[in-house]
Amino acid sequence: MLLSVSASHRDADLADLERLSSGVGRVWADAPLVAHGLDGAGVVLLATCNRFEVYLDVADGTDPQRALAVVRDLVRTVPESPLAAPGADDDAAGPGPDPSAALRVRVGDDAARHLFGVASGLDSIVVGEREIAGQVRRAIAAARRAGTTTGALERLFAQAQRTSRAVEAGTGLAAAGRSVVGVALDLAARSAPPWPLARVVLIGTGSYAGASLAALRARGCTDVRVHSESGRAEEFARAREAEAVPPGELLTAIADADVVVSCRGSVRPVLDAAAVAGARAAAERRAEERAGHAVGTAVQPRPLVVVDLALHRDVDPAVGSVDGVELLDLGTIRAHAPAAATRDVERAREIVDDAVAQHALVRAAREMDPAITRLRGRVREVLDAEVGRLPVGPVSREDAERALHRLAATLAHAPTEAAREAARAGRGEEYVEALRLLFPD
């Protein structure tokens, strides 16, 4: 039985999603426990900047509320985010609200419909964005590597990817290049210099950093410097014809930048207010020097736009209070996400519904697999017995005919006895109808 336990930006605020996603490692570590506790065998985890979802393949008859309780127990003890919400009282005591309360469970076709819609970008902050398709693909790949996937989950996620491609091809949602990164850069462009003149620092080297760099290049930005605390900046930048920020030079690079895009997703912020304020002070001194003013003369550097695309905040919210700095985070992006055309969304949902119906047919057919296996096993047993009765060496036509007749008689014996029993029980018509299904005229 297919189940999904999930929360998204539609059900919870980003702070709760951040806390849920903090438990990704724990959910993976306890995946065998989840499967064992639910008498099932399959777990796939999908955690992105605006959702936390667990897909389960469990035994038929499993109570969905039990599955919900198991997942809630796994994530309930996730620690608070290392960042307080903007304006929070530092002296406030006690834990925040339980983030697992936002989780909800879906069963069967509802779970499939949800995943197909997610993979198609219909449940994203920016409706129709294509980044989620890659995240869905990586989720099933991660489960495969962890050994927690099953045939049913493989088929589900394969259909989700086919549905995503069908929505992309059959609607205009993807044609506009809609994405979280795209909306963020459009917002940044309101305050930044024209992209061909802008100096950008990119923090991170993961898939989101790659998407961000591609989006910057598409807008004509050529001056991009890449920073990574993991040491992968050189390799990442070289492969994409960008420049790496030397180790220890991040704040110097920020002092020269017009835009900072961070998508590292670290547990602790990469940038805090003090560091950014220091970089701004250095930028002001350089502006004074370029203007030929005496040191201490007020010369304001160009504004700095900081874009934080990480769910686990890379940038302390207090950075937004630094003079001359505009901070754009996922909350800002969600508030400014453009609406998709109603016609495209309706067509996309039709495609999703068709995919759900197709998946249900496939799933129903696969439910007969155990019966088919038993049938084939019985035929193999009878065949092996008859082959064992044949003489060693060449077999005459007469011996082959006798063996085949015995095989046919043996195979027909049980159905024949069942036919007589059905007639005695007054169920002869049911048997005849079943026979027509097996051997149509």
Curated annotation (Swiss-Prot):
Binding of NADP(+), residues: 204-209
Single Gene Ontology MF annotation: glutamyl-tRNA reductase activity
Pfam families linked to this entry: GlutR_dimer (PF00745), GlutR_N (PF05201), Shikimate_DH (PF01488)
Catalytic activity: (S)-4-amino-5-oxopentanoate + tRNA(Glu) + NADP(+) = L-glutamyl-tRNA(Glu) + NADPH + H(+)
UniProt GO BP: protoporphyrinogen IX biosynthetic process from glutamate
Enzyme class, UniProt record, top EC level: oxidoreductase
Binding sites annotated in the UniProt record for substrate: 48-51, 124, 129-131, 135
Active-site residues, Swiss-Prot/TrEMBL: 49 (nucleophile)
Pathway participation: Porphyrin-containing compound metabolism; protoporphyrin-IX biosynthesis; 5-aminolevulinate from L-glutamyl-tRNA(Glu): step 1/2
Region: Disordered, residue numbers: 81-100
Ranges that cross the membrane: none
Feature type site, description Important for activity: 114
PROSITE patterns given in the database record: GLUTR (PS00747)
Keywords annotated in UniProt: NADP, Oxidoreductase, Porphyrin biosynthesis
InterPro entries the record matches: 4pyrrol_synth_GluRdtase, 4pyrrol_synth_GluRdtase_dimer, 4pyrrol_synth_GluRdtase_N, GluRdtase_CS, GluRdtase_dimer_dom_sf, GluRdtase_N_sf, NAD(P)-bd_dom_sf, Shikm_DH/Glu-tRNA_Rdtase
Organism superkingdom: Bacteria
Keyword Thylakoid among record annotations: no
EC numbers, comma separated: 1.2.1.70
Entry's free-text remark on domains: Possesses an unusual extended V-shaped dimeric structure with each monomer consisting of three distinct domains arranged along a curved 'spinal' alpha-helix. The N-terminal catalytic domain specifically recognizes the glutamate moiety of the substrate. The second domain is the NADPH-binding domain, and the third C-terminal domain is responsible for dimerization.
The protein's assembly and partners: Homodimer.
Additional remark text: During catalysis, the active site Cys acts as a nucleophile attacking the alpha-carbonyl group of tRNA-bound glutamate with the formation of a thioester intermediate between enzyme and glutamate, and the concomitant release of tRNA(Glu). The thioester intermediate is finally reduced by direct hydride transfer from NADPH, to form the product GSA.
Recorded family membership: Belongs to the glutamyl-tRNA reductase family.
Summary of the function given for this chain in its UniProt record: Catalyzes the NADPH-dependent reduction of glutamyl-tRNA(Glu) to glutamate 1-semialdehyde (GSA).
Protein name: Glutamyl-tRNA reductase
